[in-house]
Amino acid sequence: MKKILSLLTLVLTVATYGQVITPEDDGLIPKSDIHYSNTRVVPYPFLRQDDMMWSTRHWERIHVQEKLNHPLYYPVVPLPDRKSMFDVIKDAILTEGTIQEVYRDDRFELFLTPTEVYQILVRVDTLRDPDDPSIILAVDSIELKSPNVISWEIKSDWYFDKQRGEMKSRIIGISPVVKDPQTSEIYNIFWIWFPDARQALATNIAYNPDNNVKRLTFDQILQMRYFNAVVFKEENVYDRMIQDYKQNRPMEQLLESKRIREELRDYEHGLWQF
């Protein structure tokens, strides 16, 4: 028995001091021991149409300047272990090919190929000689990058699941909104069918301001709604955005957004009142 205990003590001692940390690990624990990589997407819970007793659709805007939303924006320059959500999506479309459902609008009608996406992200301006247009004086390449992203827009369905007795949301689409570095125009680059983007978002980590050990993926941040957003449109018979009927009144637009959120909360609370 003493021999067995001595052997176990020796093995534990070797294991403790056998942990080799190199400068490449850049931390207290070897990167090989840190389980950052994720290989699968957590599937949505099964939802029957009969269990979905009520639903509505919202369009929301996530401003990346807000502190809570910083994990979706930074780092603007990719780091060895993480990159911004914009770079994750861009690489997944252009390089990895894991995101294929890319469209021009939120109705998902006008499909974009990777080549067309690249032409949107990288614009080439040619300066020609006014006297002889055949002579090219200069070629300027303008590329949209992470620092140009000012917000993200998401399209999601809210529904009450009577089987589970809870209000849930499911993201349908997501779109980066940029400010053009040349013209200062603000516009949506493209819309992505969100279920098609989950694989790329679930295999890339974001910064967790609460605990650096427990890293979160971009998919987890979006699914848990670990962000602050403003509703700018609710599904309606006129298909209008809030700014269409609250023109030039930013304060009233914010109040309307708040009213829509409170209406959603009150509906859920009303179901539990007897």
Name every feature range the model reports, one short phrase each.
Residues 166, 171-186:
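Extended serine/threonine-enriched, polar tracts that run as long, contiguous segments within proteins
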Residues 183-196:
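Short linear, low-complexity motifs centered on an aromatic residue
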Residues 10, 17, 165, 185, ...:
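Short conserved micro-motifs at the rims of enzyme active sites and ligand-binding pockets
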Residues 19-163, 194-274:
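A domain-level signal for the mature, folded cores of soluble proteins
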Residues 148-150, 170, 188:
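Residues that flank catalytic or metal-binding motifs in active/ligand-binding sites
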Residues 1-26:
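Bacterial Sec-dependent N-terminal signal peptides
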Residues 3, 126, 175-177:
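Assembly/interface hotspot detector across virion components, adhesins/toxins, and nucleic-acid enzymes
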